[in-house]
Amino acid sequence: MIKPVAVDLPYPDMCDVTVSRKNALCLSPAYAAPHGELNAVLQYTYHHFNFDLVSKEVSDTLMGIAITEMRHFDILGTLLLKLGADPVITT
């Protein structure tokens, strides 16, 4: 079973986040722009497939990193919503 590759530390709490267009605009590119979280998910998944026949261990590690990036994508999307922005995917 493939497991996420991540440090076992809690993510910051978002319960005190309030609407802020300025902060949302600052963070939006990290969500789904060319160098954002979505692209990281796609790149690690792509490399996972390419390494699958070469090294199962490397392939599984790459997918574990992709899973962690998916979690970041989810967290950032939730944060953007709390900041009052639509988490638009613009790859």
Regions found by a protein language model. Name each.
Residues M1-T91:
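Non-heme di-metal
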